[in-house]
């Protein structure tokens, strides 16, 4: 824990408190993730993920790793860069004992690859859309500026709420003017 915090330049966390209290540790991990994601270099990411994943409470470590995945996905230049970055982390992620935690992170990576491919110009099919989580469908319904993607979500979204968000956004004057 001390090395992880020092490597991120975080010196105001009591290491003994962090070791003893999962809430303090979780907060420290969030700060480490913020520093790590804001760095231009991705060279230390795998080691940082490995250190976080050694936490005795997998839910705490999984949450921190998912936060890093989310932040990096929003920084990369496209799906190829994210695919390469995430592939480097998968051996560490696959060390998680709980299969549900491993699967959750793998699904999140898949979701972001789907999102980034759309941002890169790919128009998904209903079958491809069905393979992403409700969470990602909602992100797309709320953020996509593509009328074609919104129409797909309106027709094939997995939940009524997703379909309604997409339908309402597709009909907004602001979006149609773009």
Residue ranges and their predicted role:
Residues 1-178:
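Alpha-helical scaffold segments
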């Amino acid at each position: 824990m001390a090395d992880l915090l020092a490597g991120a330049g975080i010196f105001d966390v009591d290491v003994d408190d962090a070791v003893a209290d999962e809430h303090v540790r979780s907060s420290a991990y969030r700060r480490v993730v913020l520093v790590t994601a804001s760095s231009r270099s991705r060279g230390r990411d795998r080691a940082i993920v490995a250190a976080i994943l050694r936490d005795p409470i997998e839910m705490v470590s999984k949450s921190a790793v998912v936060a890093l995945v989310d932040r990096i996905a929003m920084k990369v230049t496209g799906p190829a860069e994210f695919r390469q970055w995430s592939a480097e982390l998968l051996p560490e992620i696959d060390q998680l004992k709980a299969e549900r935690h491993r699967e959750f992170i793998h699904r999140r990576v898949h979701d972001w690859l789907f999102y980034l491919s759309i941002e890169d110009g790919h128009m998904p099919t209903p079958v491809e859309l069905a393979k992403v989580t409700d969470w990602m469908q909602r992100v797309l319904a709320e953020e996509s500026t593509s009328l074609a993607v919104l129409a797909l979500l309106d027709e094939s979204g997995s939940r009524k709420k997703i379909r309604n968000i997409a339908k309402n956004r597709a009909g907004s004057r602001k979006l149609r003017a773009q």
